[in-house]
Amino acid sequence: MNNTCIRPIRAEDNQAIAAIIRQILIEFGANKPGTVYYDPTTDHLFELFSADRSAYFIAESEGKIVGGSGVFPTPGLPEGCCELVKLYLLAEARGKGLGLHLMENCFRKAIEFGFTDMYLETMPELRNAIGLYERAGFTYLPGSLGKSGHFGCDLWMMKKL
């Protein structure tokens, strides 16, 4: 994608990125209870990621928001562990390396924050993302960690940073 940039989220991005996240969950049939689809914080990501040791990155192409991803210190995770959260890309932005680029930004930021491990929660419906996570070095866990409240996610993965 030409003229693509990754930048920190801004307050004015809230509505667009929330719409993208929900659109993608509908696209994959993953718009179910216990996911970010129904999580009220999805509408306020700028505010959510103003918390200490958290960051959210927006992917923009030709001046249009096409996705994003973040790092969050989810309560209840083991010491030194953060969560990779809300990695979503519009169909037009997939398959071009942008998802990996977003994750690499998150990895660097997590290391900068002092984290040594990164956890994520996902669903089988998001099969494209699962392949990306596997290629990035995430391995499967037998159960969930932390207290994200996303009981609709039934796949859990971890990566050493």
Region spans (language model):
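A generic, residue-level signal for flexible/boundary positions that often mark functional hotspots
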Residues: 3, 83, 120, 138-139
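Acetyl-CoA-dependent GNAT
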Residues: 4, 8-92, 103-105, 109, ...
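Generic detector of contiguous secondary-structure segments
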Residues: 6-14, 115-124
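Glycine-centered loop/turn positions within well-structured domains
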Residues: 15, 96, 155
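C-terminal "cap" of GNAT-fold acetyltransferases
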Residues: 20-23, 116-119, 123-136, 142-161
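Conserved glycine-rich acetyl-CoA-binding loop
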Residues: 64, 77-78, 90-104, 111-113, ...
